């Protein structure tokens, strides 16, 4: 990455054409931005954009779509770079992203009086787009389930957004550390801990659900709990680092993630949540 700066431009372009391009493209952007000088990085972005335009011409993909994809991937990644440079701590940055997510959730419910109706309208628009694109069956299935989906949309969108950008930052910092052979800069993902404050906040908001049946409180409880899946994953990485679990165990976790998404994330969240209370790492060390 450092010896051949043009390799960075190639990486930026190619990762936007891969599956999960927002994650791999964003992580590559974070790593290169941290590694390169500002001038070299701007050159890499320019070359990558030129390369994407040429690729679009060759394989008959809309250049506008490729450039919009680049903007939608790189702009949030740039904000993550600014955040990590300010905090100088990966753990604190991920915690701040969680705080921003909670604040956004509260702001959303303050601004939108009836979130379910809001998401109903959004999903109906999506259904219309699917119909226009010839995906009639998918549009029909969406329309039939629209009420149930709309009730879950707020928590799903916010939790997924936080998860995606946290993973982008973690992966980008990991690539950067490898490129400079410094495993300690910005701290280690294996040390991620949201602490007892968030654990208590999750418990209190969950208990209040038995007294107050309000949507924002329900979403807040689920959102706070969902943060802990990443702490559960970091604990697995710590166990692997300490050679308590084999590499195959960690690999299987990632392999199963797309197939048992909700179940596995819930299990990881339970591990992470209990870790916040009992600090498994210290107990195992002792």
State where each predicted segment sits.
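Small-residue-rich helix-loop
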Residues: 178-232
């Amino acid at each position: 990455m450092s010896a051949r700066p043009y390799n960075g431009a190639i990486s930026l372009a190619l990762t936007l054409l891969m599956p999960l391009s927002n994650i791999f493209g964003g992580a590559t952007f974070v790593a290169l931005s941290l590694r390169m000088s500002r001038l070299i990085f701007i050159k890499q972005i320019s070359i990558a954009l030129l390369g994407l335009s040429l690729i679009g011409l060759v394989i008959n993909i809309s250049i506008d779509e490729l450039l919009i994809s680049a903007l939608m991937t790189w702009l949030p990644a740039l904000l993550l770079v600014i955040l990590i440079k300010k905090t100088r701590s990966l753990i604190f940055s991920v915690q701040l992203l969680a705080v921003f997510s909670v604040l956004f959730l509260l702001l959303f419910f303050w601004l939108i009086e009836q979130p379910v109706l809001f998401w109903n309208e959004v999903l109906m628009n999506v259904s219309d787009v699917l119909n226009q694109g010839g995906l009639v069956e998918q549009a029909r299935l969406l329309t039939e389930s629209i009420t149930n989906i709309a009730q879950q949309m707020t928590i799903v969108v916010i939790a997924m957004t936080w998860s995606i950008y946290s993973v982008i930052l973690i992966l980008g910092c990991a690539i950067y550390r490898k490129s400079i052979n410094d495993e300690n800069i910005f701290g280690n993902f294996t040390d991620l801990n949201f602490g007892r404050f968030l654990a208590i906040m999750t418990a209190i908001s969950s208990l209040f659900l038995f007294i107050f049946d309000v949507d924002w409180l329900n979403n807040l409880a689920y959102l706070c709990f969902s943060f802990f899946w990443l702490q559960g994953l970091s604990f697995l990485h710590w166990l692997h680092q300490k050679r308590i679990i084999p590499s195959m165990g960690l690999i299987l976790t990632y392999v199963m993630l797309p197939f048992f998404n909700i179940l596995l994330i819930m299990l990881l969240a339970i591990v992470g949540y209990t870790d916040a209370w009992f600090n498994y790492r210290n107990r195992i060390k002792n």
